[in-house]
């Protein structure tokens, strides 16, 4: 009987906490999607709340400002993305195959988002980072951090490719930075032109940059 009473008291609290978590997750997802679809400056707190179906009081319960939501939303996006990155860049796969599959993932994601939003969205980190680079240091730093985190996967694959002799580049750090710049540039160009064709030869361009000696089919 006492246990039943205890459960009865605990259950509403658990349900309330679950609902709060779901509300916060909804705000993070909607905020991320809206800003990736358009821009940080064009999306207001009202826009996020309206799309999420959540009142502003709940928004400010979780986030002091739109900027704070963005920082957390981009961190959450990276946490969700990491398992796919770990799988693609698994050391069990040949290094060039890892890089190939990464390029294919980029194209697939851009194609999916273009179909969803009606236009090419580009890289979310590059877009918000460049937009706010001189306006919000916290967001700029977070965008840089997440871009660097992705670059580490590329650097590791290039280092393995150098060791096995499947590429002509010699410095994995320099090559990964150059490759990251290429990827960001092509994604920006695809967004500006609103044309996925810009990315159709992404894989081939990357392989040429690395001086790949053999490429898997």
Show which residues each predicted segment covers.
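Amphipathic alpha-helical segments used for helix-helix packing
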Residues: 114-138
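Hydrophobic alpha-helical connector segments
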Residues: 72, 86-121, 176-179
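Hydrophobic alpha-helical segments that form the core
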Residues: 121-127, 170-189, 205-208
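N-terminal intrinsically disordered/low-complexity leader segments
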Residues: 1-22, 216-217
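Generic hydrophobic, amphipathic alpha-helix propensity
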Residues: 23-31, 48, 73-77, 81, ...
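Amphipathic alpha-helical packing segments from all-alpha helical-bundle domains
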Residues: 97, 101, 134-162, 204
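Amphipathic C-terminal alpha-helical segment
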Residues: 41, 109-113, 134-135, 160, ...
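Helix-turn-helix
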Residues: 26, 34-73
């Amino acid at each position: 009987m006492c246990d039943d009473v205890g459960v009865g008291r605990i259950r509403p609290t658990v349900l309330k906490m679950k609902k709060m978590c779901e509300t916060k997750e909804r705000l993070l997802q909607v905020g991320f999607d809206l800003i990736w679809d358009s821009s940080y400056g064009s999306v207001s707190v009202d826009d996020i709340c309206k799309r999420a179906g959540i009142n502003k009081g709940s928004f400010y319960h979780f986030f002091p400002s739109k900027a704070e939501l963005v920082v957390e939303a981009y961190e959450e996006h990276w946490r969700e993305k990491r398992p796919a990155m770990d799988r693609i860049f698994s050391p069990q796969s040949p290094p060039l195959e890892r890089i190939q599959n990464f390029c294919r993932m980029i194209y697939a994601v851009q194609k999916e988002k273009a179909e969803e939003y009606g236009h090419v969205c580009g890289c979310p980190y590059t877009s918000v980072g460049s937009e706010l680079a001189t306006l919000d240091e916290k967001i700029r730093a977070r965008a840089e951090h997440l871009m660097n985190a992705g670059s580490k996967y590329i650097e590791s694959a290039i280092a393995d490719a150098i060791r096995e002799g499947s590429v002509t580049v010699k410095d994995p750090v320099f090559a990964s930075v150059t490759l990251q710049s290429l990827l960001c540039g092509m994604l920006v160009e695809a967004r500006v032109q609103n044309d996925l064709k810009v990315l159709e030869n992404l894989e081939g361009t990357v392989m040429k940059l690395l001086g790949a000696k053999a490429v898997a089919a």
